Amino acid sequence: MLSKKMLRDIAKHKTQFLSIFLMAFLGVFVFAGVGGESVGLEVNVNEYYDATNLADGWIYSANLDDDFVDKVNNLNPTKDRERQLVMDSVADFSNDPQITLHFLEKNNISTFYLIDGEEFNVSDENGVWLDKKFADSKDLKVGDNISFTFNGIEIEKEIKGLGYSPEYVYHASDASVIPDFNKIGFAYLSYKAFPLSDVPYNVLLVDFDGNAGDYDDLLSDKLDGKYNSFIQQSEHVSVSQFSEEMDQHKMMGDIFPVVFILIALLILLTTMTRIISHQRTQIGILKAVGFKNRTIMFHYISYGLWLVVAGSILGLIVGPLTLPNLFYPSMSSTYILPEWKPAWSMTFVYVAIAMILMSVVVSYFAVRSISKENPADTIRPKSPKVSSSGFIEKLGFWKKLSFNARWNYRDAKRNKFRGLMTIVGVIGCTALLVSAFGMYDGMSNLKEWEYSQINHYDSKLVIDEKASLSEIDDVAHEVNGDKIMESAIEIDSGNSKKSASLLVLNDTKLVTPTDYDWNKVHIADDEVSISQKMADL
């Protein structure tokens, strides 16, 4: 009998109960959907790193001779190491794309992830294994030839394979934060493909046991002055950028569902309070004919319970199957992973269970007061609340308000919770709108700040390291440019060490360092300026 009554009540108040179902569904749908996307990113990238054995760290030096490599290998935590020569080149296309060449001594660490063609062969001096994203943008395929120019030397190789690299999950040029795969790429070659007899290796990839910070300290202690810098895995540009992206998605997935869940619970509380108030007589009759308070309470608690259970289950199923597929196409245009698939986490179930339990608690608070009344009092209509005059009604402007304004104020005063729900709902919706537009404005301001306020140049030329000062002056005069120096450095604050980029400026107007308020930062000859993020680290 009570089940039929519940169904009739739900049909009678279908709009309110539909809202409860939809809010419960949306809350779990967004949490499980965005969570499935962010957890999927983490699972996919970790599987990718494991499959390719991403390096634990990179040691940079201008001279990685056999003696230095042996000393690194003899350090107790070191499990494996291999040298590479990493250098910039220009591919033979009309837009002069920049291709980072990797000449490999071995291929055991940060290995090439093959998509098409044959596996990387360290003994093959005629082949090149090319970035698939770049190859697709240029309509290149396995078997085609491609030419690269570096340091005045041109080499032509046959494309033996197309694929990805774990070091290039994120890869953008210095002048852009959004990758343009038509202008940048990477290529893996054997050390035998290098045109000179001696390969000037400049990067040593290492796998090691233990903490990266401890390994950094050990390098500094044993090999101080024999290398330029050490970058641990978490500080690598590609790794850190993708990690920050995952953190942003996790934060978004944690915040946005809260709004829907709170609104669902508020709607449930006000709806149940209104239904119970209207059904006082029915509740009194149920008590009079022998129904226990426990039975009546469960009857009304079940109104929201089954709707929230249905919405939560549907959200758990639909969310991870649909929302990630909306994010991944845009993500794949910026980041490179061999696989994009959502993942599941028990956290989604815990949130759904928590929401169901909260709906039970909310319904309980709505029905508990009337359950304590005896049948005779429950059958009688509830006496209206007596609203006393507040301080606002004693102010002079009160009489100047219209009748509708005074009515609305007194009605909100008598139904404080309903008014609170309205305020919270408006705050939540406004916060979502402001956050969305704020994010858009923030990205627009970032672009304006980076490319109008700080950098004023159209292009940047990378000078050969062997060029003399007079040759550099001639180039600068020829292109009407200014000279700057960029280098990788290691900052030691006593408590921690961090890898950073050093930028040395002459009296140039093409680069203007600024603070957060876009004010120009003046740096004296005996001063140095560091970024706020580096200062925080």
Task: Please state what every model-predicted region is.
Residues 269-274, 279-281, 305-337, 345-372:
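Small-residue-rich transmembrane alpha-helices
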Residues 55-62, 134-135, 183-233, 242, ...:
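A short beta-strand structural signal in non-transmembrane regions
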Residues 16-21, 26-54, 252, 323-330, ...:
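Alpha-helical transmembrane segments
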Residues 93-138, 177-180, 186, 449-453, ...:
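Short beta-strand boundary microenvironments
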Residues 47-90, 104, 214-218, 452-494, ...:
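Membrane-proximal extracellular/periplasmic loop immediately following the first transmembrane helix
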Residues 1-32, 301, 305, 388-428:
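N-terminal Sec/SRP start-transfer signal
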Residues 15, 37-38, 42-45, 50, ...:
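Peri-transmembrane interface segments
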